[in-house]
């Protein structure tokens, strides 16, 4: 019953054996061809652009994205820079106000992509002009001469709810400057360059250029004595892009390369043992970026995952080939023969691991998140490129060097054999342990599985963009301060559509907006709301000489239209932020504290429940804005990763069944593959660690990496059983043959991923720690659980040689 499977694997092995011999004999042709492909990939990669905007996540036909584009057409960008300040004397100190007036002008004149800047020095103010008119003017058009004059203005402003909490705190200790932007994170890269010819590097793009300009202005000596807390969309997004792509990622990549290099030197102790694997990884990366350029995609947010994945795959393939080559080089003393024998044994499992890993990644191509779907395709291409490079470029590197005589003296043979003796002895002891305690191992894993399943039931899916930053990053601290003391830094927008031009002038529509606004204000996370209703009430009150009894919506459509006409003729412009040009649509903006997406989603759900209970009659409403777009993105990526993991698991299971032509073996091999994910997720559940959009990447990545080790060990075990006909002897032979490579690969990857602990991004840090844990658990499962299952279930068929009663070898 094992014959056909054995013949298939042997036949595939002979193909790779021939490839190894041909590559050795024609190494210069292989090298030239490889560099030609490399050069072509580099040429194609030069056409790829960097685009980390929100637009990189959504397809143009996505309804949520389409709604946001409609909102942008009506109301322009909703992104802001929010600068809260504190100084001796408070926000209404005359000297401080002079500095803020100067700051406001500087921001308007010098910051790229600014639409408008509002502070206490220039905020639009409205008051009555009896008997039947109003005055609309900038607050400090005529700057007060004395502190007393400024206090008179203060008393007027503090009576207006529109300003309190947004431009000035209720106790007047804090003030704020709001920098409205003309661009947003969804805009194409062509529209956010500062210098049209300056390229697509982050320093030339919005919001980085705007953030840098604001920071430079705030640090000028003329503003000494004022403490600034710079937050808002511009500060948060610019910091994220800069820290992740220009500061954190290059350092972590360099550190990871250094650690992996030192590990390879320690293990192989020769240049080819280091240069070869990195040439494989570099080739795979070049092909991946070349695919991006060929298809016409952009390098986006998710691209940062690709180097990590390809390092793992490329190093794993290389270590298996190098380890096997070392064994046969010592045994045969001839490089060509050692290469042929190595590829005969390692080539088929490397191909299978590459195919299953690529298939696992391709399962993510069904994601509604554009950048995730793209990552799936170019990562799969990189995985296959790493495999091709492993059996060609790496072979070329191994072909160089002195030949070792196969008839070397026994003394030299023993000296070579001592290399790796300690690890080999440990692996043999491990095999003995599994044989002796296989039942205990199975029971222990079963108990851990049950406990992990319980832990998984306690897992929550949640994300918090702010806590992606470590507390060392200033923008995290400033944002938390702003959220605690002023209006929030997170924005959710509701758009009310009356269905007709001038329909917003209908009092019934305005009352519906007011009703939803009051409902939103009941939520603990909503710190401030803005709508056309606030302005209409202010206009009505101003027409009645500031009488608070008239801080209400006018009774008739005609009166609303008259008030708006007078307001605009008086120079009022603020209302344009809340009304479409045809008066058909109006916005309600909620400013919220930046916190977990589940809590922010609770705001939307509360309003949805209110609208279900009390439906709108005069208008329709939709939720949008950059904040709502982010909530939708997190929802998309969360469930697409869960879906992707399930698809990857199914695809890999089917491939394992096909490879071994056995449902039993295929399903059996998946137990050690899913065990790392189950155990780690269960541990997270018990520890109260939630799954965010970043940590959710662990499952499909872990399955892709875990299956590699399983395939290598399973195929070797199957091969050795076919030769020996004895499960115990086959286990010893398998651990001796492939165990060393599995241990070395896993150890190198664990150390490499643990370099993420030095990240200043907490999300990246936790991802590295969890992925290292998954790899370590996967190795334990492959070394303990899988052999115990095979010894118990005997999936390769009956033994043909009676096993010794002793468990020792």
Where are these regions (language model features)?
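Short helical (or helix-break) motifs at transmembrane helix termini and adjacent helical loops
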Residues: 309-330, 350, 357, 392-393, ...
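Signature of alpha-helical transmembrane segments and their immediate interfacial
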Residues: 3-50, 396, 404, 412-464, ...
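Juxtamembrane segments of multi-pass membrane proteins
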Residues: 432-558
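Extracytoplasmic
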Residues: 69, 73, 98, 144-270, ...
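Hydrophobic transmembrane alpha-helices
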Residues: 261-265, 281-282, 298-319, 362, ...
